[in-house]
Amino acid sequence: MSKSSFQNRIIRAAKLDSNLYEEVEADKGALWQAMAVVIFSSIAAGIGIGLKTGGFSGIITGSIASLISWYVWAYLTYFIGTKFLPEPQTQADLGELLRTIGFSSSPGLLRVFYFIPGVGVLVYLISSLWMLVAMIIAVRQALDYNSTLRAVGVCVIGYVIQIFVLVLIFSIFGGTLPDAPD
């Protein structure tokens, strides 16, 4: 796949193009692209926060954490969506969820603008909500759902489980959860 096709996929994912999510669901070769979108989105957030706070030490750690989180999130949505809340036509594998959810991170590229006084927080908030909507579409398409509400349910259940696991990990190994950007 050419560079322009990859860029086109990122743009289509950000435009919430459901056909794009079907396309990457079916393209087994798109896993590396999906991973790159997750990394780029994480780096963009790290740069935006770093430019505002004056520190860039968390970019690598944040990127690694984003990759782990992406995998865990894809597994949770796969498991919940195929085992607990499937529709009759639901047929998916973990790779399909990894690819679609990875591309749903594309609006997060805008988080690079977090440092801009007066609008940065708004850009960060809007891009985060945009990513959530993209993720719901990605989950709906990957799990072959007719119901967007069911995809929302899978995302909410997965989110609650992931937060519980994070709190458990931090309480066992120490440390605190990171603060949200202000």
Predicted regions and their residues:
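Short helix-capping/hinge motifs at transmembrane helix termini and TM-loop junctions
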Residues: 52-53, 85-86, 115-119, 144, ...
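Residue-level signal for alpha-helical transmembrane segments in multi-pass membrane proteins
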Residues: 44-51, 134-140, 168
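Acidic-enriched, low-complexity/disordered segments with a strong bias for Aspartate over Glutamate
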Residues: 27, 93, 144, 179-182
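Selective recognition of hydrophobic, aromatic-rich stretches within alpha-helical transmembrane segments
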Residues: 56-80, 95-164
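Selected alpha-helical membrane-embedding segments in polytopic membrane proteins
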Residues: 2-92
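Juxtamembrane boundary at the C-terminal end of a transmembrane helix
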Residues: 164-182
